[in-house]
């Protein structure tokens, strides 16, 4: 084995036609799983035997494909504006922010309980041990149509009730960049924000989200193999007390070229396994014993050096600079971190 403990597996694209599938008003595993010889239930049994928690990604909101007999129609389930035009999700060009094309239709938050009902059936049918809530843990939108009018405050309540029902059903939920309304229900969070929104008015980043969550809900930041700068993102995780999150596929990266998923350009697991195991061990060893503690203070000591202090007095120093730094009698290597445990 690689010596990696406390793993969590997120399995995306397993239902309703894949990553960009049909509405979750009905749930059906993709047929390729059967051809591969491993059912959803068998996968989870295998992971459980290895002590790995599995979270199956579900989409309670986006509808990428609208097919005959899939139970969804925009007329019945889609949210709309006061003038009855559909509310949908568009993709935009990065260069100038102009609209590219429709990315997906939506399911009105009015039907959150109906979607949760379909997911609960799937939980029972396929013995799902955990769900990743995806966009529903952060994305709130209204529905202005008279027949199922739902403002954002009502939507928040409806999603909260759905999460509560799903938590009761599976026992384990994961959030994705989750807002406050999802926190009472989730056991783990991915894509937790590690830095500011980058507005020019801001001088420094403070890991506020991490400071609120640490010691209550374990979390990780973005998938670090997808980051522009792996090393900086890795150090951000250390500064913020976050777990390491990787997004992988079994096949070669070239499989995704010229598809809707070509943004996933660095995801073949074989290229990352050794690096991930090595970095995990380094962080796990250094931060052992701090997982359940609160972060009580965060300081920017100099331009490239931060200090995160935990409730037992332990301090984690991160140096983003290209030269070694000295702080509190501790030398922090270039582009590295150092830990002073509270008992030292």
What are these regions (language model features)?
Residues 1-67, 154-161:
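Aromatic- and glycine-enriched glycan-recognition loops and surfaces
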Residues 11-15, 135-137, 321:
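A mature extracytoplasmic/lumenal domain signature
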Residues 60-128, 137-344:
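Active-site-proximal substrate-binding groove within the catalytic cores of carbohydrate-active enzymes
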Residues 6-8, 53-55, 129-132, 172-174:
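Structural preference for beta-strand elements that scaffold enzyme active sites
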